[in-house]
From Swiss-Prot:
One of its GO terms (cellular component) is extracellular region. The keyword Transport does not apply. Responsible for the anti Gram-negative activity of immune hemolymph of Z.atratus. This is Coleoptericin. Residues 1-74 are annotated as: Disordered. The keyword Protein biosynthesis does not apply. It is found in: Secreted. GO terms for biological process: defense response to bacterium; innate immune response. Pfam families: Coleoptericin. Its main location: secreted. Belongs to the coleoptericin family. Keywords: Antibiotic, Antimicrobial, Immunity, Innate immunity, Secreted.
Amino acid sequence: SLQGGAPNFPQPSQQNGGWQVSPDLGRDDKGNTRGQIEIQNKGKDHDFNAGWGKVIRGPNKAKPTWHVGGTYRR
């Protein structure tokens, strides 16, 4: 388990076919352990992004948050 004050563990972004995946796991000084992931795809005529995050353990533990968005250019 991650102890209070432990370093965050951002994983290197991974790219595959224009998709970029960025996972992250960290713990803050209040004892909250948060995991999150961001996904992006930037193309010639579009941008897409989505993310999911959750405080897994700690005083701010709650339901996950998420977002999805994008743009299309003609």
